[in-house]
Curated annotation (Swiss-Prot):
Entry keywords, A to Z: Cell projection, Cytoplasm, Disulfide bond, Glycoprotein, Lectin, Membrane, Receptor, Signal, Transmembrane, Transmembrane helix
Leader sequence segment: 1-22
Protein name: CD302 antigen
Biological source species: Bos taurus (Bovine)
Cysteines joined through disulfide linkages: 128-143
């Protein structure tokens, strides 16, 4: 039987799982779903939340926005495992006095919240939102902070890049699959060809060493020759 395709041919498949990671700007970013995250681990002095936001925009991102429980949990887990674990993270959120609601700086919809139990009648002008890293709850606080321990930024993966990445993975998978199939077929054909050659060589070799007469024929011929000699 032909041997299976060498494992080395399958090694490129291992790279497909990591292909999506290349969608983030660099290895210092962490990807989750359709976004990339980076925690700028440096304390900075600020006069307003815009100073914090500028830290993110300088990296082509914006302050963090959170849209579901899974993302909230991911941020908490990553803060503990990979980043310094500050007590609170400033969220990219502001209070819009025009319609008396909180909004994200990145203009995404407010589809999720994790507010801790607080009084609803508190003054919300100049109020910012913070993620408490120990509990995962959000809490309101004064935007006039003098410093922050670090800035958490988020950048969405562009649609074009995601689309190209998905197609690149599909094309790579098809190419690798085709290569493996052709390799296996080639191995089968080569095996059958070698077996055919070996079989033909054995047949010729056997025929070359086979006498055209058996023992009985040789004995009869010898007796006839002896009889002819006696009567001549």
């Amino acid at each position: 039987m032909p041997r299976a395709a060498p494992p080395a041919l399958l090694l490129p498949l291992l790279g497909l799982a990591a292909a999506a990671a290349a969608d983030c700007p660099s290895s210092t970013w962490v990807q989750f779903q359709d976004s990339c995250y980076i925690f700028l681990q440096e304390a900075i002095k600020v006069e307003s939340i815009e100073d914090v936001r500028n830290q993110c925009t300088n990296h082509g991102a914006d302050m963090i926005s959170i849209h579901n429980e899974e993302e909230n949990a991911f941020i908490l887990d990553t803060l503990k495992k990979q980043w310094k674990d500050p007590a609170d993270i400033l969220l990219g959120m502001f209070f819009d006095t025009d319609d008396a609601s909180f909004k994200w700086f990145d203009n995404s919809n407010m589809t999720f919240n994790k507010w801790s139990d607080q009084e609803d009648d508190e003054e919300l002008v100049d109020t910012c939102a913070f993620l408490h890293t120990k509990t995962g709850d959000w809490k309101k606080g004064n935007c006039e902070v003098s410093s922050v321990e670090g800035t958490l930024c988020k950048a969405a993966i562009p649609y074009e890049k995601k689309y190209l990445s998905d197609n690149r993975i599909l094309i790579s998978a098809l190419v690798i699959a085709s290569t493996v199939i052709l390799t296996v077929l080639g191995a089968v054909v080569w095996f059958l060809y070698k077996r055919s050659l070996d079989s033909g060589f054995t047949t010729v070799f056997s025929a070359a060493h086979q006498s055209p007469y058996n023992d009985d024929c040789v004995l009869v011929v010898a007796e006839e020759n002896e009889y002819d000699i006696q009567f001549n």
